[in-house]
């Protein structure tokens, strides 16, 4: 698995790794692209462990991290052989197929609800707005009549 590392690894990469005893058997990387969009890369499972659900666990762990950090969506540049795997996890294709590093690939995207992180603020705004509306209604309806 050491061949799955690149120049981004020391500065802005977050990893998820599944171990079997002390051996890493599945891994994936998270890269922030913008303040609201991130990309999952280099999701790989050793051949002897394929079909055990480890790739899905890595992807789900990185999605949880993405959601917790407040990103809105995730993209993946998937080899065509893995496209169905990501579609089964809720990713949708976009754009045309393309050749990358000698492999045909397809980009996929999944919306990750940023709303959850900001829900407390949104609820507070709604409550304050509602209270203000009630206050204005009550003060207007309780004004003395001429």
Curated annotation (Swiss-Prot):
Transmembrane segments: none annotated. Keywords: Acyltransferase, Transferase. Its EC number is 2.3.1.-. One of its GO terms (molecular function) is acyltransferase activity, transferring groups other than amino-acyl groups. PROSITE patterns: GNAT. Belongs to the acetyltransferase family. Residues 1-120 form the N-acetyltransferase domain. This is Uncharacterized acetyltransferase in arcA 3'region. SUPFAM superfamilies: Acyl-CoA N-acyltransferases (Nat).
């Amino acid at each position: 698995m050491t061949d799955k590392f690149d120049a981004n690894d020391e500065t802005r990469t977050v990893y998820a790794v599944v171990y079997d005893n002390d051996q890493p058997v599945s891994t994936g990387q998270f890269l922030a692209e913008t303040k609201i969009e991130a990309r999952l890369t280099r999701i790989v499972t050793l051949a002897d462990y394929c079909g055990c659900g480890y790739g899905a666990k890595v992807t789900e762990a990185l999605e949880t991290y993405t959601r917790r950090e407040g990103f809105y969506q995730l993209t993946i540049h998937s080899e065509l052989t893995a496209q169905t795997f990501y579609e089964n996890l809720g990713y949708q294709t976009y754009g045309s197929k393309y050749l990358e590093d000698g492999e045909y690939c397809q980009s996929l995207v999944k919306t990750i609800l940023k709303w959850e992180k900001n829900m407390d603020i949104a609820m507070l705004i709604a409550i304050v707005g509602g209270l203000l509306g009630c206050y204005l209604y009550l003060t207007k309806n309780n004004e003395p009549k001429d």
